[in-house]
């Protein structure tokens, strides 16, 4: 491509501050931004990034389609919510207009195993209009490529076990609420945990209905199996609340989470495969106490056993860096809903983004 990659930012919250700056620093340009928050509509994106004004202002969602038709971006970066159902309209709008899209929506990383009908709806429309839709973020490397790379150096694998923790304070209110932060244990049990006390048949019915609430690792395990060529035999999910012995104030929730109430949750996903390899992954998302920090640890068991630990990863920056480095891959990919394990490894882009676009 002999011009700058044109990007529209969908959602201008905490993540967008980094993503938009990274796009400019990688030689792209943000030509539009969309939000529903009346406090940011009309604001210059430079102000949102803490930089000089750019002349590009935030458009309201009501005017999004018209703006997209006018600026004709190469790709939209959708950074709003955590469930496919909640970003569906944004992704379908992109697919309808033939605009590529990449989203940090965690379910979108591999939504075929949690909301196949909506995924197919997006897939069909994207194919019809010649664009690619995908999900990426922190998990693309740290719950995905890092593990499959270790697997590539292993003679025999019997089990893969992973655990990752993160502070829900860093990602905004949608994510915090999705983790049950601030709920009493009774509310958590009713609103979050009870959804997983069901049979495999019932779970499949909920998945087909589009109402399943997957933890992040649910989609990650599906991605790993696809990348490693494994056939899923069964997959289960259990969610348990995390608590603290002292009150913790959450700036994201705008309230104090009382001692003994849920600060978030741990979700454990277990996948059995036809090939005999088990994948067990745990995701811990909560409002951190003062002495807690992010940690990502995975072990590939077999011949030999290998453990990799990433302590205190800058998860927000790594999420946004992954998305921006993926942009050329998305533009180059075949049309449809194409998950990133089919795009090849995520690589560092040393040159301007457009130089990687075929």
Segments the model singles out, each with a brief description of its role:
Residues 78, 82, 94-115:
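ADP-ribose/adenylate-binding Rossmann-like module
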Residues 36, 81, 105-109, 138-139, ...:
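Short, ordered loop/turn segments at secondary-structure junctions
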Residues 6, 10-14, 152-286, 291, ...:
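Active-site-lining helix/loop region of Rossmann-like oxidoreductase modules
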Residues 1-96:
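N-terminal glycine-/serine-/threonine-rich beta1-alpha1-beta2 phosphate-ribose binding loop
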Residues 103-104, 133-136, 161-162:
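General beta-strand structural signal in soluble alpha/beta enzymes
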Residues 106-130:
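Rossmann-fold NAD(P)-binding glycine/threonine-rich loop
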Residues 127-156:
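Short alpha-helices
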Residues 286-358:
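C-terminal helical cap and adjacent loop that interface with cofactors, partners, or active-site loops
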């Amino acid at each position: 491509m002999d011009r700058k990659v044109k990007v529209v930012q969908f959602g201008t919250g905490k993540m967008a501050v980094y993503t938009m700056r990274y796009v400019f620093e990688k030689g792209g340009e943000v030509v539009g931004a969309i939000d529903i928050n009346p406090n940011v509509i009309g604001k210059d994106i430079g102000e949102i990034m803490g930089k000089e004004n750019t002349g590009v202002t935030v458009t309201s969602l009501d005017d999004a389609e018209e703006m997209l038709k006018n600026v004709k971006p190469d790709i939209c970066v959708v950074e709003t919510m955590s469930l496919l159902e909640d970003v569906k309209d944004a992704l379908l709008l992109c697919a309808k207009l033939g605009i590529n899209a990449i989203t940090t929506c965690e379910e979108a990383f591999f939504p075929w195993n949690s909301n196949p009908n909506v995924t197919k709806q997006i897939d069909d429309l994207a194919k019809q209009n010649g664009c690619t839709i995908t999900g990426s973020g922190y998990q693309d490397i740290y719950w995905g490529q890092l593990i499959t790379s270790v697997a590539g150096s292993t003679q025999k694998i019997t089990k893969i076990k992973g655990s990752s923790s993160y502070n829900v304070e860093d990602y905004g209110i949608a994510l915090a609420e999705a983790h049950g932060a601030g709920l009493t244990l009774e509310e958590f049990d009713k609103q979050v945990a009870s959804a997983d006390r069901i049979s495999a048949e019932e779970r499949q019915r909920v998945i087909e209905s589009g109402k399943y609430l997957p933890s992040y690792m649910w989609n990650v395990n599906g991605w790993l199996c696809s990348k490693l060529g494994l056939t899923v035999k069964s997959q289960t999910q259990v969610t348990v609340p995390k608590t603290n012995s002292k009150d913790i104030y959450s700036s994201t929730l705008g309230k104090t989470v009382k001692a003994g109430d849920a600060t978030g949750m741990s979700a454990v996903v277990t996948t059995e495969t036809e090939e005999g390899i088990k994948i067990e992954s745990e995701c811990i998302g909560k409002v951190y106490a003062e002495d807690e920090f992010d940690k990502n640890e995975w072990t590939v068991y077999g011949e030999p056993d290998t453990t990799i630990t990433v302590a205190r990863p800058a998860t927000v920056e790594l999420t946004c860096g992954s998305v921006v480095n993926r942009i050329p891959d998305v533009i180059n990919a075949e049309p449809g809903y194409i998950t990133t394990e089919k795009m090849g490894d995520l690589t560092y882009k040393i040159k301007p983004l457009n130089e990687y676009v075929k």
